[in-house]
């Protein structure tokens, strides 16, 4: 029987990491000899006893560059498994895991988290992506639209496993919204170009300057765009309306206390935060970006959609929601009826079935 290696060089605290914990905690009782390779310090992450951790030995290692982490984890993969039969479940840095799998003669299952739009327009990038990913033994994607795009642009077959979500009931409130009775907005995601939070800030600036609406935005996440977003907030006198809150462990507690959830990404896979907002019964406005939001919101049936970057339309949708909350609230109530799509046990069992196809050979 092959060793099972979970490959994730950088654990940064987001949707990918949440799926990592769900998957590892579920499969640890289903298989023996499970290893997790990462270049991150794992003191704060709750993995089960059956998961054997492989990390850099240097206690001082604290490099934040994902490329460097991927190189180090590739070295650890070769060092520890070059003479063993193994199966790699790659949740990140798939180029590295596929390449190394050929060196050590291992099987490899890769999970794609975000749609590969950036490779489509460049011929060489597209060729490289298609060639390398065709070497994977199996490709897992997290939405049906993702599967269609992968086949359409790269002629690659894949298996859809929707994100598993644990729905918990919480009444916890956050101090930022305490005693504030007007429009409470929340957005969650890494502060990166992909998440495109500047669109939301521009929309809210437009809202502030053109309508007499009192609002507050709680923006959860960390990343390299922090300074850029903070400058925009201060330059437009939005500091009383918007708080950059950094990373928060239990994001669902914050969603629950808001009136409106907004996602502004340029591209996604299947964003957990939208599903968590649905579970909390909070109305949603999201970009119609490739590939997951449209599927989660069922083409606008379960929430409002707008084109990426269109902050004017976003402003209008927020204003419309403020003036008439009933329509979007009806969509959020309806959304709860479709949460079965993200069933925790059913979707995680799909990982077990997929792994079993390769683990014994």
Go through each PLM region and give its residues.
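A conserved mid-protein helix/loop that constitutes part of the nucleotide-sugar donor-binding site
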Residues: 14-22, 183, 190-209, 224-230, ...
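Conserved acidic donor-binding segment of nucleotide-sugar-dependent glycosyltransferases
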Residues: 298-311, 320-325
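Short His-centered aromatic/hydrophobic patch
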Residues: 70, 89-96, 112-113
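Nucleotide-activated donor-binding/catalytic signature segment of Leloir-type glycosyltransferases, i.e.
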Residues: 230-246
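N-terminal strand-loop element at the rim of the active site
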Residues: 6-65, 147-151, 223-225
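Aromatic "clamp/platform" in nucleotide-sugar-dependent glycosyltransferases that forms part
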Residues: 247, 266
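Short hydrophobic beta-strand element within catalytic cores of glycosyltransferases
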Residues: 283-287
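Carbohydrate-associated surface elements
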Residues: 145, 164
């Amino acid at each position: 029987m092959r060793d099972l290696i979970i490959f994730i060089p950088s654990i940064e605290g987001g949707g990918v990491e949440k799926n990592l914990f769900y998957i590892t905690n579920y499969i640890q009782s289903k298989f023996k000899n499970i290893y997790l390779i990462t270049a991150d310090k794992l003191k704060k992450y709750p993995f089960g006893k059956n998961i054997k951790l492989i990390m850099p030995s240097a206690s001082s290692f604290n490099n934040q560059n994902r490329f460097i982490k991927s190189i180090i984890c590739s070295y650890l993969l070769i060092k520890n498994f070059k003479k063993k039969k193994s199966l790699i479940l790659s949740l990140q840095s798939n180029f590295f895991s596929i390449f190394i799998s050929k060196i050590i003669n291992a099987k490899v299952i890769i999970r794609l988290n975000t749609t590969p739009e950036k490779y489509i327009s460049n011929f060489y990038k597209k060729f490289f992506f298609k060639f390398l990913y065709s070497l994977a033994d199996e490709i897992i994607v997290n939405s049906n639209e993702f599967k269609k795009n992968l086949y359409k642009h790269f002629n690659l077959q894949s298996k859809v496993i929707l994100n598993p979500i644990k729905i918990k009931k919480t009444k916890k409130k956050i101090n930022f919204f305490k005693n504030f009775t007007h429009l409470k907005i929340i957005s969650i995601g890494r502060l990166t170009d992909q998440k495109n939070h500047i669109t939301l800030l521009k929309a809210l600036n437009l809202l502030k300057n053109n309508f007499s609406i009192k609002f507050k935005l709680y923006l959860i996440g960390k990343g390299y765009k922090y300074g850029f977003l903070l400058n925009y907030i201060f330059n437009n006198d939005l500091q009383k309306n918007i708080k950059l809150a950094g990373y928060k462990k239990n994001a669902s507690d914050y969603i629950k206390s808001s009136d409106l959830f907004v996602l502004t990404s340029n591209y996604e896979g299947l964003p957990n935060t939208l599903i968590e907002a649905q579970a909390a019964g909070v109305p949603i406005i999201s970009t119609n970006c490739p590939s997951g939001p449209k599927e989660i919101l069922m083409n606008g049936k379960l929430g409002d959609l707008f084109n990426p970057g269109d902050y004017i339309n976003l402003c209008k949708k927020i204003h419309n929601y403020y003036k008439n909350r009933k329509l979007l609230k009806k969509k959020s109530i309806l959304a709860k009826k479709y949460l079965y799509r993200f069933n925790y046990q059913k979707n995680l069992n799909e990982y077990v079935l997929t792994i079993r196809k390769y683990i014994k050979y």
